[in-house]
A protein has these predicted regions:
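Membrane-proximal intrinsically disordered regions of secretory-pathway and membrane-system proteins
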Residues: 6-7, 105-107, 139
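Short, helix-capping/interhelical loops that line the mouth of catalytic, cofactor-
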Residues: 51-98
Length: 151
């Protein structure tokens, strides 16, 4: 499985981010391209230990069971629900380059920190994840949204 802790996989995502353009057309979903980048950035801050979301009630009930559908080689399903904490609406299209650069910096920090520094804080839906599960999930999350905008 692809994993942001793997250098080749990390570089693939960084290259796809580099090729992302502000005028890329959304293929599905509701977020615009800048909201999507900000969403990815905030979500990557959880395993980096920069934010600490509360567990969703539904996640406490079924998160462990559903986790297997996400921690695998299959692409994430389109139009999956998004935790409200990760829905970013108060951002301008002018922030595209800033958010794109921030994404590259956060990915690099995640990789450089290594598994040892991965936060133990539970995922808001899936609960406790190992560092490798975080790496796989984050790679898939970036892949999902980059495909959403054709990158």
């Amino acid at each position: 499985m692809k994993n942001l802790y793997n250098e080749v996989d990390k570089n693939e995502i960084l290259n796809r981010l580099e090729n992302l353009k502000v005028d890329a057309v959304r293929q599905w979903g509701k977020m615009n391209i800048v909201q999507m980048l900000a969403h990815l950035n905030v979500s990557l801050e959880t395993p980096l230990g920069k934010n600490f979301p509360k567990r969703a009630f539904i996640g406490r009930l079924i998160g462990k069971l559903v986790k297997k559908r996400f921690i695998n080689d299959q692409p994430m399903p389109k139009n999956s629900p998004t935790d409200k904490m990760y829905v970013i609406t108060d951002i301008s299209m002018k922030d595209f380059e800033k958010e794109k650069q921030r994404a590259k910096e956060l990915i690099t920090l995640f990789y450089n920190n290594g598994r040892e520094k991965c936060s133990q804080h539970p995922h808001s839906f899936f609960g406790k994840l190992t560092p490798d599960e975080w790496g796989i999930l984050q790679w898939k999350h970036f892949d999902h949204h980059l495909r959403q905008f054709g990158a």
